[in-house]
Regions:
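Short loop/turn segments that connect beta-strands within beta-propeller blades
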Residues: 83-87, 136-140, 180-184, 232-236, ...
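Short glycine/acidic-enriched loop and turn motifs that connect beta-strands
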Residues: 76-78, 121-125, 173-175, 225-226, ...
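A short loop-to-beta-strand structural motif that recurs across blades of beta-propeller domains
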Residues: 78-80, 130-133, 175-178, 227-229, ...
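Blade-level signature of beta-propeller repeat domains, shared across WD40, Kelch, NHL, RCC1
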Residues: 299-332
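Asp-box/WD-like beta-propeller blade repeats and closely related beta-sheet repeat scaffolds
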Residues: 42, 126-163
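Secretory targeting and sorting signals
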Residues: 1-32
């Protein structure tokens, strides 16, 4: 397998820990107390800091042990952090070139609290820019990496495997990259290439990724075709998952809770739920429901038993406006 050993590619300084951000509230925005679910003691939505020129968001990762969530900003690459019980999130990592990051997409957290960030097109046409980053829970830059073997990787989403490594999907080619510590640094390697099975077609190809219940496979969404694919964790072998004829076009984030899989269909403004086998091979009992018509949800994660979904603002043109939200229990 092709491998690249990590060192930081950008020397820009990083401020560890949470950086306090000023949050401008929009007209008619509810107060923090009004946004709180009094029965659970948690907000029903969380406000993200935004740029004066407008912001868009995409990924979310959660740290169950510390009760934290992290949200990636597409416009600039900032990373925001919040807690389960605080209605206002704060900027955690700066963007606009910090550590070579100008945009950010998928994000996840491992058991140690390390935060993995997919760069989307960050490195395309810019060989000195990383494709992905790894930070410790206190904000220390651990790795800023290019992936091997391709100059136009669009790293979309990321999930932690049963082996503790992080697996990143490529929305341009049907590839998955594995990132893990190696020696005295970090390594990114091409883990699976399904070019002989999955066709690269116009639009976003591989995106959302979730580990099966038994850890034997990743379930991966191909948004432009609405297909679901199974990648065996033992060797990366790929096979199609029969979705029972379900319309899953614009499939983006995947959330697995036990044997239920949720597929968030961003611009379709729909959410599909289905039963999925423990090995990720078979789905059945597919149901669809509309999501909020005024929001474009991209993905979600479960924090302390509750689903948190990112409102991307992707549908607001030419520039989005606040307030910017992560929504709790968005389609309960």
């Amino acid at each position: 397998m092709k491998r690249i050993i990590a060192t930081a590619l950008a020397a820009a300084s990083l401020t560890a820990g949470i950086t306090t951000a000023t949050i401008t509230t929009g007209a008619g925005e509810a107060s923090a107390s009004e946004r709180t679910d009094q029965g659970q003691g948690r907000p029903d939505r969380y406000v993200l800091p935004g740029d004066a020129a407008g912001s868009r968001f995409e990924g979310i990762g959660v740290d169950q042990r510390r009760g934290l969530f992290y949200v990636s900003e597409v416009t600039g690459g900032e990373i925001h952090r919040g807690t389960a019980r605080d209605a206002d999130a704060e900027q955690w990592l700066a963007g606009d070139g910090t550590d070579g990051r100008y945009t950010a997409r998928g994000i996840t957290v491992d058991r140690a609290g390390n935060v993995y960030i997919a760069g989307g097109p960050n490195g395309i046409g810019n060989p000195d820019r990383p494709d992905l980053w790894v930070y410790s829970h206190d904000g220390e830059l651990l790795a800023a990496l290019r992936v091997p073997g391709t100059a136009d990787a669009f790293l979309n989403d990321v999930a932690i495997g049963a082996d503790g490594a992080a697996y990143f999907t490529n929305s341009n080619d049907p590839q998955i990259f594995r990132v893990a510590p190696a020696g005295d640094g970090w390594a990114a390697e091409l883990w699976a290439d399904a070019s002989g099975t999955i066709d690269r077609v116009a639009g976003f190809n591989l995106g959302g990724i979730a580990l099966s219940a038994d850890g034997s496979a990743f379930v991966v969404a191909q948004g432009n075709t609405g297909a679901l694919w199974r990648f065996a964790t033992v060797d990366g072998a790929v096979s199609a998952i029969d979705t029972q004829g379900a319309d899953l076009v614009n499939a983006d984030g995947l959330v697995r809770q036990g044997n239920e899989l949720t597929v968030i269909r961003n611009f379709s403004k729909m959410v599909a739920t289905m039963r999925i086998s423990a090995d990720g091979d078979t789905v059945h009992r597919v149901a669809q429901r509309a999501s909020d018509p005024d929001r474009v949800y991209t993905t979600a994660k479960v924090l302390h038993g509750r689903l948190l979904a990112v409102d991307s603002k992707f549908d607001e043109q030419p520039a989005p406006s606040g307030p910017y939200d992560v929504v709790g229990s968005p389609w309960a």
